């Protein structure tokens, strides 16, 4: 059996945000065994799984990605939406637009320190739409 839910997250500031609880609030009862596919419908934000216990991880992600892919690169052509836009597309392509999480005993089978992240790469990204597909 397959269920699908489309929902919007509230607007987040630029950075990395743990959204595990927000995602779970959108889902009905999970099957005993299955998989959750989570897809973001945007090209300047991403979803990933990473450590959710230490807030320094969030800050370090932002610092590293901004060091590797800075704004205001003089050779970028796609700049009409702002200097943060093209770097946001590149960062989103690197991290990706979807994740898969196993469902075991009716719960997401995440590791002890793992959480679902929204990676917001725009200064003013706005509400982000996600599609959650639960396959049992």
Residue map of PLM features:
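Active-site histidine-anchored catalytic micro-motif
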Residues: 1-136
